[in-house]
Amino acid sequence: MRNPFVRLLVLAGALLIALGVATQTSPHAATSSAARLAQLDAISDYRAKTWRWQALMSKPRTPTLYTERRSKDTTYLRWVRDLWRGRAVRAHRLAQHPPHRREWLCIHRYERHPGQGWATRTGNGYYGGLQMDISFQRTYGGELLRRKGTANRWTAAEQMWVAERAFRSGRGFYPWPNTARSCGLI
């Protein structure tokens, strides 16, 4: 009778020790997993921002092999995160300076409503600081129109890049005949 009781006691002790060890390593494993997921989220966010700015500027996407998805090395994940953060910052900086920025700002000066600026919406069928109609927005800024609504909801950079697409398509500054003339552009 003693023998089964001793065996049961030893088994219970071993089980308690095993559970104690498991609970001691569990928080570290959970923290490591949470840190990895946070890094992956940050990488994904910076990559999406980079690609969004590149798409706005009609530039090709920076390619990726998604190697971070297969890695558990936190140093490598931090490196990839910092790489994409740098790319996002550079793409954002580039997007703030469209090739004809000075010209778009001149057109904006005459097209905008004084109290509304880039968010101009006067009810005349034209939207934003460059007064784009729906057809123009659909043709040159369809993705923005779907995602954000009319041009009065777009940032100044987004409006200028959409205008830049029209310019590059061969239309030049002619969609704004009066203001472009006032600016000496046509």
Regions found by a protein language model. Give the residues of each.
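Peptidoglycan cell-wall recognition and remodeling modules
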Residues: 93-186
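Generic intrinsically disordered, low-complexity segments enriched for polar/acidic and small residues
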Residues: 8, 43, 50, 63, ...
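Short, flexible coil/linker segments at or flanking structured domains
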Residues: 3, 7-9, 17, 34, ...
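Secretory targeting and sorting signals
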Residues: 1-29
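Intrinsically disordered, low-complexity
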Residues: 19-109, 180-186
